[in-house]
């Protein structure tokens, strides 16, 4: 990065989206609050070239902008700049400024403001200010993905199958509670899988069954680490403004399937993991009740390991899947689960449903950081703690949807509403920084198995559950 800056003398380096926004003047009020920021933004607005490689204030200002401006889909907030007095040269580069809290943060667009040739200036362009040069600006290139994909890409889920904002609901059908069975819980609406005449546990498309691993062959700690890695990568990619009720809440309407793609990708992963757990318990017709009990115990151990990794997302999904109707009504299976595992499951249910926000604050250790006004100091403090945290995104979606529907968009209540929404998004932003502290490696064998595993649909799961352990007449 330092070498690149050296090769760009007198260059203003910033993301292309932020550059366009500053040209529109949309950030003057919110960003230009300090003298250093005022100098930088004023220079950008009037076409001056700032040698940021020699300016600590400039580096800190760009750091703050990068952390607070939405990295994708910025067309929601502004239109492309109409001015033709600027020119920007783009390059893609991993940003790393030691000491400023941006190590391994994201891949960004680097831009260089350059002076055009004299014949490039258009006669109808507005006259530049005294002492300044006229510049031209071509169309910006699209930014690359902010984070590298984890191993093989997850299979795309059908957007139409993702539920509306109230996607947390109870699964259909009766839910008889086993003797020591877990309490009923809310689950994500599972993604419907293609119909299969004979579903097989752990069956993977286009591979012979004898080569397939059993889910229980993966140690609980390894499973927890791989799930945590997937959850962390997805959560870091979530674009915060897509979680707002006014955006995500409209995604289920016809014609809005393209809205909130990062949120939809995260929910699709929730659904896939839920179906994976259900299929591992029900998909093999040769399994007996005691075999299914061992699988249930295995997933309880995985959830416990996820909790030790502060992966509250997978903890919620695993507990919800085990408490769903297809698995929860297996009386013989639950009778074979050890008392120790049942006790652990009850503790997991209690921690999953009670005081989630307090657990997140304690796990992420950012209670003090939220009171810090300097954004760079907050980021550096979280990075030094080296504690990774992955929250359950559904909690934030539910809260933001409630704020959007409960508080009207009138003049009196709008300020209060937006303040509460911003507070939630700020917490999510801090947790995204904490999610960067994981140092885990993907296991190709597990990723391939997880992404290509054939899964049971809702109807198949419930029907098979009733066939394996029918209710007493």
From Swiss-Prot:
| UniProt entry keywords in alphabetical sequence | Cytoplasmic vesicle, Guanine-nucleotide releasing factor
UniProt biased composition (Low complexity): 134-157
| PROSITE patterns listed in its UniProt record | RASGEF_CAT
Can you name this protein?
Ral-GDS-related protein
Which Gene Ontology CC terms are recorded? cytoplasmic vesicle; plasma membrane
Please provide the Gene Ontology terms (biological process) for this protein: Ras protein signal transduction
Q: Where is the composition biased (Pro residues)?
A: 173-185
CDD domains (UniProt xref): RasGEF
> What molecular functions are annotated in GO for this chain?
guanyl-nucleotide exchange factor activity
User: Does the keyword Oxidoreductase belong to this entry?
Assistant: no
What is the annotated localization of this protein?
Cytoplasmic vesicle
User: Which gene is transcribed and translated to give this protein?
Assistant: RGL4
Q: What is its main location?
A: cytoplasm
Q: Which cysteines are cross-linked by disulfides? A: none
* Residue segments, region Disordered: 117-215
Identify the residues that the record assigns to the Ras-GEF domain, covering every copy. Answer: 219-471
Please tell me the species this chain comes from: Homo sapiens (Human)
